[in-house]
């Protein structure tokens, strides 16, 4: 399970969006 990585990437994408 990669919840941290998923959330991290999602956070970056959302912030960069």
UniProtKB/Swiss-Prot annotation:
Keywords attached to this entry: Calcium, Cytoplasm
UniProt keyword Cytoplasm, yes or no: yes
Primary location recorded for the protein, binned into one broad class? cytoplasm
Q: Where in the cell is it found?
A: Cytoplasm
Gene Ontology terms: cellular component = cytoplasm
Function (record text): Involved in calcium binding and microtubule stabilization.
Which family would the database say this protein is a member of? Answer: Belongs to the TCTP family.
What is the recorded name of this protein? Translationally-controlled tumor protein homolog 2
